[in-house]
Amino acid sequence: MDKKQSLKTAAYEVFSKKGYKATGISEIARQAGVAVGSFYNYYESKEAIFLDIYIDENNRVRQAMIEELDWEIDMIDLIGQLFAQSRTLVSSNKILAEWYNPAIADELHSYYSSEEGKVANPFHQFLVKTFTNRMQAEGYSPEKIQDILQVYNLFY
């Protein structure tokens, strides 16, 4: 395993146990078996490695949601299930629950609301494609679909 992957693995373990605020770079480096100075060859800050960990964890959890939900049910019911499952999975996951932590929330929200974050987010792309296809199949006009997707983008 290379040093960057060792740092990510260690950071995942430490953040999962202690949370964002109580975790320090020195502890991550020690757990990874690398010098603190080496940490900065791969990440510029604790925020940067946490964002990397958060993105991976979010993608993993959201992929599980894609596989578990029935995407063919009524759209209103589907949206309700989507929100309920998201709440459950986020609140039970120490890393994803940091979304609400003022110490890191701005960084997370900024990334996910950016164009880069949306393009790089497979779950976002899946939802846009899935809901667009469903609305087309149900006879929504292209203008109505666009309006609905604009509202979706306000929330996502």
Feature map (PLM): residue ranges:
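Hydrophobic/aromatic residues within well-ordered alpha-helical segments
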Residues: 46, 53, 57, 61, ...
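Amphipathic alpha-helical segments used for helix-helix packing
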Residues: 88-112
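N-terminal intrinsically disordered/low-complexity leader segments
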Residues: 1-2
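Helix-turn-helix
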Residues: 6, 10, 14-48, 52
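Amphipathic alpha-helical interface segments
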Residues: 10, 14, 85, 89, ...
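Amphipathic alpha-helical packing segments from all-alpha helical-bundle domains
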Residues: 62, 109-139, 146-150
